[in-house]
């Protein structure tokens, strides 16, 4: 069973998972949105149950889409203060959106074992001299961080991965068990409707790393 689509009030039609009710969620942070994958099955034979896009911005609050671009002309210290209101709004959006997904899964008899989050890692943004590049970098960190906070607020076990380090972590932890991480991801993609891009694969990999696994 799989579902594709956007996250609008969690309008999903999940079916019961027959073999196991344990699932994990993988999230790939993007600007103003996240690619989400719900993964079931086992470590050796994972199964994509759903893939969808979660909105992390409110069209009624334009600044939530690219908050640092809105204050790009300010110094780093001033921009940090200026984005507080929009950042708080984004945090609330992420918390509620993830909560709706978790609730839907639970209503359908599934137990969420944890969430894996992929995105830009923390860095010293103040050292970036170009304001436009800094705005993009800051938003990359922000939209990953709000997913971290959303997972914590919803009481989920969480692992967070740098997008640049995820592949090597997956090889180290899953390679021997999966018979080849890339091959398995490609095999999973053949059973699903498009899209099946790098973002969906990264979200799936993150979910795979927390499926039935201990907290890291």
Show which residues each predicted segment covers.
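Short hydrophobic transmembrane-like helices used for membrane targeting/insertion
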Residues: 1-3, 17
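Phosphate- and other anionic-substrate recognition elements at nucleic-acid/protein interfaces
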Residues: 16-216
């Amino acid at each position: 069973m799989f579902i594709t689509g956007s996250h609008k009030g969690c309008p999903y039609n999940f079916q019961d998972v027959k073999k196991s009710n344990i699932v994990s969620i993988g999230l790939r942070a993007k600007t103003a949105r996240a690619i989400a994958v719900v993964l079931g099955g086992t470590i050796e034979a994972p199964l994509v149950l759903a893939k969808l896009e979660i909105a992390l911005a409110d069209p009624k609050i334009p600044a939530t889409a690219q908050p640092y671009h809105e204050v790009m002309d300010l110094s780093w210290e001033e921009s940090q203060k200026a984005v507080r209101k929009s950042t708080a709004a984004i945090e609330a959006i992420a918390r509620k959106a993830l909560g709706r997904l978790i609730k839907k899964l639970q209503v359908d008899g599934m137990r969420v074992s944890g969430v894996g989050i992929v995105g830009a890692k923390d860095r010293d943004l103040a050292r970036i001299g170009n304001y436009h590049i800094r705005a993009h970098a800051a938003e990359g960190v922000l939209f990953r961080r709000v997913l971290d906070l959303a997972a914590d607020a919803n009481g989920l076990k969480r692992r967070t991965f740098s997008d640049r380090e995820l592949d090597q972590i997956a090889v180290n932890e899953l390679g021997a068990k999966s018979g080849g991480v890339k091959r398995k991801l490609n095999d999973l993609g053949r059973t699903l409707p498009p899209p099946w891009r790098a973002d969906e694969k990264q979200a799936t990999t993150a979910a795979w790393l927390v499926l039935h696994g201990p907290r890291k």
